[in-house]
Regions:
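Conserved AAA+ ATPase small/helical "lid" subdomain
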Residues: 130-136, 140, 144, 154-179
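Switch/connector loops and helix/strand junctions flanking conserved nucleotide-binding motifs
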Residues: 8-10, 34-38, 110-114, 138-142
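AAA+/P-loop NTPase substrate/partner-engagement loops
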Residues: 19-46
Length: 179
């Protein structure tokens, strides 16, 4: 998924996972710049959390590689194997991900920009590229209304009292319009 930050790429991945009725494993690469992140991806000592253990435990059908444009090229080999062979291998486990939907999000706006910065070897492994266009004010308002309606429904389903208050929605609308 290509497009500006905040336009719904991650939410779309969550929605896909929800529609499939499965868990989603999310790796947010903006936070994966440390040695502990490297150990998480490629396998820590037995007993510690790792991506492979999480994939095994959750048997997820959706893997979200969020903000993939921020990944260190040192991680690419693991993803070549994942994309090419449908297998994720770390220091301790081998996990079949051939039936998983693997979604990468980036803040690149065009295919050319993504290929230039990610490099052809990794970019050519994506089977489909979807570009998210910038969201206009009307779209933001529509999204805010849907989120508000979802919140009301969720609270009502939990038998908690929430007074529907149009001033809340008006506040959201004002923030969106004024920035």
């Amino acid at each position: 998924f290509l497009g500006d930050s905040g336009i719904g790429k991650t939410e779309t991945a969550k929605y896909i996972s929800s529609c499939l009725g499965t868990d989603m494993v999310r790796i947010q690469f903006s936070m994966q710049q440390t040695n502990s992140a490297y150990q998480y991806i490629f396998g820590a000592d037995h007993g510690e959390d790792s991506l492979a253990r999480e994939l095994i435990r959750r048997s997820s059908n959706v893997i979200l590689l969020d903000e993939f444009d921020k990944v260190s090229p040192s991680f690419y080999n693991a993803f070549y194997q994942m994309f090419d062979e449908g297998t994720f291998v770390d220091a301790n486990y081998s996990v079949d991900v051939s039936k998983c939907i693997i979604i990468c999000t980036t803040n690149y706006r065009t295919e050319e920009e993504a290929e230039k910065y990610l490099g052809t070897p990794i970019y050519s492994r994506f089977s489909k590229v979807i570009i998210f266009n910038p969201i206009n004010v009307d779209d933001k308002l529509r999204i805010a209304r849907k989120c508000y309606e979802r919140l009301i429904a969720q609270v009502n389903a939990e038998d908690k009292a929430l007074i529907e208050n149009n001033s809340i929605l008006s506040f959201f609308e004002r923030v969106i319009k004024e920035g």
